[in-house]
Design a protein with these regions (language model features):
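Inner-leaflet juxtamembrane helices
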Residues: 103-124, 196-210, 301-328
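Helix-loop-helix junctions within predominantly alpha-helical proteins
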Residues: 58-97, 123-198, 211-229, 270-302
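Terminal membrane-anchoring module of integral membrane proteins
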Residues: 1-57, 149-153, 224-377
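Charged, amphipathic alpha-helical oligomerization/scaffolding segments
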Residues: 93, 97, 120-123, 127, ...
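N-terminal signal-anchor/initial transmembrane insertion module
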Residues: 1-146
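Long, hydrophobic, amphipathic alpha-helical segments used as structural scaffolds
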Residues: 106, 132, 136, 218, ...
């Protein structure tokens, strides 16, 4: 798998460029059937090598997942438990390996929307470069690239360690279907969470660049030379940036909804297992099962943080800084009526349309999901 520096920029947006390693990982895992044209632009083709690979991989792992669930359901419970807890245990087994079968199906239908979203990023970058300046070669993007590459390499190391640990686990080493499906499911969930995290980092860097450029303009010009045209350019760019961030709820609505519910279920089951069986597992010295529950709890709780709060605090700080800059601009001097109106509209736009990276109560995600469902009727 490649890193950022190995992926040609061409006419791709910096968002596409930074997330390139994760798209490669999705393609290898068979969850995202896409190709790239001569300019490196992301696109989906129904008939292509990538699509055939995704279909064959999906069919193979669909069967493997069914066989793995069947195998796990027949295994005796690790300790004595009630019928209700047996059902929960089997449900937990199924939840663990479900992503290997379901996520490729969901992503197959959302790849086209992802392509459209990347195109919107390309259009946004054109306006961003015109108003703010070319971001691709700045020190800030170099720093972000290094940060993203560290995240990507950390994921690879984590998956290698996890794969070795699962391979030596007594509950999976005897069944190839369980082993392969478990590793693929964990890989899919980790890379999707990482992709979401990188998206938050890119948005944070974009807003920060916007804020710094606005600050530079204020320091360079006196208030009378900061014209209505410049203010309007900043306002329209802000609105476009806000729509782009909230568009996350449309382009991967079903995928991220599945991931959030999946991680929530795993967290709840892990807490339940530790609360009900933790003391018993320690007494019986079943440290393997205890460690598995703890790792599942920590990892999935981290994923929930990434989905629901990651990036919010940082982008909120940037947004608040922009608001303060506009208030400073508004109070610099007496403005003409037209300029004062433009600044007021700008301030209202920043207050009402804040591109914060979060999923408040699933609103943004399920808004897109509900729209997709209603469009079918």
């Amino acid at each position: 798998m490649s890193t950022i520096d190995d992926v040609p920029a061409a006419t791709r947006s910096f968002f596409d460029h930074l997330c390139g390693p994760f798209f490669v990982a999705f393609r290898v895992l068979g969850v995202c059937p896409y190709t790239r044209n001569r300019n490196g632009v992301f696109r989906k083709k129904t008939v292509s090598v990538s699509s055939m690979y995704t279909l064959i991989s999906g069919a193979t792992f669909g069967y493997a997942t069914f066989a793995a669930i069947k195998t796990l359901s027949r295994q005796p419970p690790p300790i004595a438990m009630s019928n209700f807890n047996r059902i929960l245990l089997k449900f937990g087994y199924g939840t663990l390996i479900a992503p290997s079968a379901f996520v490729p199906v969901i992503m197959w239908f959302e790849t086209t929307k992802l392509q459209a979203y990347l195109h919107e990023w390309r259009l946004f970058q054109d306006n961003y470069n015109r108003v703010i300046g070319d971001l691709d070669g700045t020190i800030m993007i170099v720093i972000v690239k290094k940060r993203v590459n560290r995240i990507y390499r950390s994921i690879i190391v984590f998956l290698l360690i996890t794969g070795v640990a699962i391979s030596w686990s007594s509950s999976t080493i005897n069944d190839l279907h369980v082993l392969v499906c478990t590793i693929k499911s964990i890989s899919i969930m980790v890379f999707i969470a990482g992709f979401w995290f990188v998206g938050a980092i890119v948005i944070e860097a974009t807003i920060d660049g916007y804020k710094k450029k606005l600050q530079t303009e204020l320091d360079r010009h006196d208030s009378f030379r900061f014209g209505a045209r410049s203010i309007e350019d900043y306002r329209l760019l802000w609105l476009q940036m806000s729509r782009l961030v909230h568009g996350v709820g449309d382009y991967m609505s079903a995928t991220v909804t599945f991931c959030i519910f999946h991680t929530t279920i795993v967290v709840v089951l892990s807490v339940y297992a530790l609360a009900v069986w933790g003391a018993t597992l320690v007494r019986l010295r079943r440290y393997e099962a205890l460690a598995s529950a703890l790792v599942a709890l920590v990892c999935n709780a981290t994923f929930l943080y990434v989905y629901c709060d990651c990036g919010y605090s940082q982008t909120k700080k940037c947004v608040d800084s922009v608001i303060l800059l506009i208030l400073k601009l508004k109070s610099l001097a007496r403005w003409t009526t037209s300029n004062y109106i433009q600044i007021t509209l700008f301030l209202n736009a920043v207050n009402q349309y804040q591109p914060n990276v979060n999923v408040i109560g699933f609103y943004e995600i399920n808004r897109g999901l509900l729209g997709s469902i209603l469009s079918c009727f």
